[in-house]
Amino acid sequence: MKLLIVEDEKKTGEYLTKGLTEAGFVVDLADNGLNGYHLAMTGDYDLIILDIMLPDVNGWDIVRMLRSANKGMPILLLTALGTIEHRVKGLELGADDYLVKPFAFAELLARVRTLLRRGAAVIIESQFQVADLMVDLVSRKVTRSGTRITLTSKEFTLLEFFLRHQGEVLPRSLIASQVWDMNFDSDTNAIDVAVKRLRGKIDNDFEPKLIQTVRGVGYMLEVPDGQ
């Protein structure tokens, strides 16, 4: 597995490179945003570890540009910016995980391995595949086991949000803010109703079931173990 680290702090970059190399990865290190973006665009990386506060080009812009260019490798943001607003922004832009400095290397390594295991979701330019679910973001075509599925505009947006964060627990509040652009009202069941309708189209007549309920929190899209 080949990783790219984009980190301008020399000691942190060297520490990450040494630890991940010893863990069996091939590692490239870029010490500024411009070089990191160039390597990410031209190299064949399985995962990127990306700082946000970088010289030349910041991490926010790198995530945005990579996703706009249909680069689908997992991105782990590693940064000192630790507010909820920063975390939500990173996920909204298309990052797959977010870890705040200072960090424990064991946790970072576990997160890297988890992201790499999420190979069940394959992004090929504008296409997602999870199990037998196929989604084309450009044509907005959705099929499961070869059967065409018709979604409303909002159902498609909700499904796309699940796909971009496959394997992550998504709280109802985050779904509300990112898919409906509204604050979550705990007295309404709007999110649950929308998810139920989406399940009715992509899960009810198929196996395995992909949208999982995380009781008391929200939802997660993943292929169940053993499937």
Curated annotation (Swiss-Prot):
A GO MF term: phosphorelay response regulator activity
Modified residues (4-aspartylphosphate): D51
PTM comment text: Phosphorylated by CusS.
Disulfide pairings: none
Domain Response regulatory: residue ranges: 2-116
GO CC term, one of those recorded: cytosol
Acyltransferase among keywords: no
Keyword Transcription regulation applies: yes
InterPro entries xrefs: CheY-like_superfamily (IPR011006), CusR-like (IPR006291), OmpR/PhoB-type_DNA-bd (IPR001867), Sig_transdc_resp-reg_C-effctor (IPR016032), Sig_transdc_resp-reg_receiver (IPR001789), WalR-like (IPR039420), WH-like_DNA-bd_sf (IPR036388)
UniProt entry keywords in alphabetical sequence: Activator, Copper, Cytoplasm, DNA-binding, Phosphoprotein, Transcription, Transcription regulation, Two-component regulatory system
GO biological process: regulation of DNA-templated transcription; response to copper ion
DNA-binding region: 125-223
Compartment(s) where it occurs, according to its Swiss-Prot or TrEMBL record: Cytoplasm
Note: The cus system plays an important role in copper tolerance under anaerobic growth and, under extreme copper stress, in aerobic growth. HprSR and CusSR form a unique regulation system, where both two-component systems recognize and regulate the same set of genes, but under different environmental conditions. HprSR plays a role in H(2)O(2) response regulation, while CusSR plays a role in Cu(2+) response regulation. Under low protein concentrations, the two regulators recognize and transcribe both hiuH and cusC promoters, albeit at different efficiency, apparently in a collaborative fashion.
NCBIfam families: cztR_silR_copR, PRK09836.1
Role according to the record: Member of the two-component regulatory system CusS/CusR involved in response to copper and silver. Activates the expression of cusCFBA, hiuH and plasmid pRJ1004 gene pcoE in response to increasing levels of copper or silver ions. Can also increase the basal-level expression of copper resistance gene operon pcoABCD.
Protein name: Transcriptional regulatory protein CusR
Species of the source: Escherichia coli (strain K12)
